[in-house]
Structures are given as C-alpha cells and as structure tokens.
C-alpha cells in the first residue's frame, strides 16, 4: 500500500480545503474562488443560509422521517442534493417548495428522493429501473410506452410502500412545530435534513422525534430475557464472581455467561461448535448430579 506523506502545513491545507468545499459546495462551478472571492461569498451567503435553511426528508404516512436527505443523497434525476438549488434569499410561499436541479440539461424541476434496493435503483411496476424514467414531472418511462408514470411497490423498512411516502421540504419553524429536531445552525451547503450523526440511520432505527422515537420507560426497565442480545444477557447481572441461579435450580457463573458471546476471530461454524460442546458438558455435569438443566439459548445476534 502506498504511503502518503504531507509537507509541513499540508494537513492544515487539506482541512482548509475540506472546509471550503463544505461551505461553497458546487457554487464555484469547479473553479476555486480566490481568497477575496471566498470572503465575499461567505459574507453574502452564510447569513442567508443560516436564516433560511430548508430541511428535506422522505416521510412515511405515519409521520416518521424514514430518510433524512444530505448533500450526497441522490435525486430521482440521479443528481445529488447538493447539485440542486438549496439557498434562497427569501423562502418561497408556495408549498411544496421546489428545489430544481442546477445541472445543465437536466429536466428535474424539484428534488424528489427515491430509495435504493441495496445498491440498485428500485423498479417501477413497468419492470424498468427508476433511472430509466424521465426526470421531468410525471416520471414517464423512457424504455416502454405502457408506463403512465413511475410507481414502485418497493416496501420501506417502516413497512409502508415507497409510493405512500413523500419528499418533504420544510422550514425550521415548520419542523419545530411538529416537534422534530433541527440541530445546530451550520454554515455548510445543502445540509438538507441532517442534524447529527444519528441522521445517517434509517428512520426505524433513529431514537429521536424524527424517527421511531425513544423507547418507553417500561421497555428500558424491563427484565433481560432470552430474546435479548447475548451481551445484555451476560452483563445484566451484578458484577460478582458468585454463581447466578437459573431456571430449574441450576447455577451459572460469569465465565459461563461470557461464553455465549461470539469471539472476534470466530466464524459461524466455530461459534456454534463451541456452543454445542459447552451444552454437552453441561448435560454431562447435570446427569452426574442427577438433574438435567434446560438448554440455554444459543441464538446469535
């Protein structure tokens, strides 16, 4: 592997360029601003960006933001969110707010998120991929004449079909009125709906008001069961070397509890074989004592 070395001050120069790219985005047209142009750009754009930021999300009928759009998130037109118009001197009054694509020749008039199926575009009911459809409003298919417009039955992780979701563009005030997080004010371009690291997760995994929400106190205080993660099953008991009683009157110590955890170097076969051998030993030891314990759960996480 080739090793990269930087001259003195090189790391600082890289950080400055990354900061420049996050602030300017695509506004320089591929040609770096001069220091004077950069300062003038920041004086003009940053106050407007902080005041009139727009939050973009892909929302399910239940109100959950299944996807929070960021700078690199692709539109139906296959261009990224940062390649669309995202800065406004005054926020438009009409709803929904249209964010047209700025790429030359693109017919996209408004940002429209479309999910991926793994790494591939999802299919329309006409059997063609999303990127085989026109980016113009109506989203007709370019590969067939029977399609009346893109319509996919792809099911989101929230359980709702893709066609039931909407791409929502809203202001800070509109988002706060719904109790959804808005994060801190940042000067970066095309931040969309990103408000923190958790924004990168899917909605059903996000434990804030934009996702599935925080678990209830009852869930947090509930006892650890055999259905929980092996780490929780091993660590929920008090940290003591005394053996812990199990169902049926059997006892197991911390070392036995920890054995249910997968070791970093183990593959699936080695993990299940080790669990099987430990179960055999427990059965033999129990038979010698005249009792057979229930087999512990070995279901991996």
UniProtKB/Swiss-Prot annotation:
This is Protein FAM221A. Belongs to the FAM221 family. InterPro entries: Fam221a/b. It holds the Pfam family FAM221. Disulfide bonds: none annotated. The gene is Fam221a. Residues 235-271 are annotated as: Disordered. It comes from Mus musculus (Mouse). It comes from the Eukaryota.
């Amino acid at each position: 592997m080739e090793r990269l070395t930087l001259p003195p001050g090189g790391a600082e120069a890289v950080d400055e360029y990354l900061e420049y790219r996050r602030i300017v985005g695509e506004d320089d047209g591929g040609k770096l601003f001069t220091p004077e142009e950069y300062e003038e750009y920041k004086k003009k754009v940053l106050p407007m960006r902080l005041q009139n930021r727009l939050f973009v999300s892909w929302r399910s009928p239940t109100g959950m933001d299944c996807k929070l759009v960021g700078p690199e998130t692709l539109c139906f037109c296959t261009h990224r969110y940062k390649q669309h118009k995202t800065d406004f001197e005054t926020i438009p009054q009409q709803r929904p707010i249209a964010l047209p694509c700025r790429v030359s020749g693109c017919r996209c008039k408004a940002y429209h998120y479309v999910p991926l199926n793994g790494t591939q575009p999802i299919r329309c009911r006409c059997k063609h991929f999303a990127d085989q459809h026109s980016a113009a409003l109506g989203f007709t298919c370019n590969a067939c004449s029977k399609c009346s417009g893109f319509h996919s039955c792809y099911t989101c992780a929230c359980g709702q079909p893709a066609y039931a979701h909407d791409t929502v563009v809203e202001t800070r005030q509109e988002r706060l009125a719904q109790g959804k997080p808005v994060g801190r004010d940042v000067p970066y371009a095309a931040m969309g709906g990103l408000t923190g690291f958790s924004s990168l997760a899917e909605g059903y995994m996000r434990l804030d008001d934009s996702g599935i929400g925080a678990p209830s106190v009852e869930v947090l205080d509930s006892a650890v069961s055999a259905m929980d993660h092996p780490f929780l099953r091993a660590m929920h008991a008090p940290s003591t070397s005394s053996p812990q009683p199990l169902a049926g009157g059997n006892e197991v110590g911390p070392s036995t509890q920890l054995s249910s955890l997968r070791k970093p170097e183990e593959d699936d076969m080695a993990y299940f074989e080790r669990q099987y051998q430990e179960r055999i030993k427990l059965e033999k030891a129990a038979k010698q004592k005249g009792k057979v314990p229930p087999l512990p759960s070995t279901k991996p996480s």
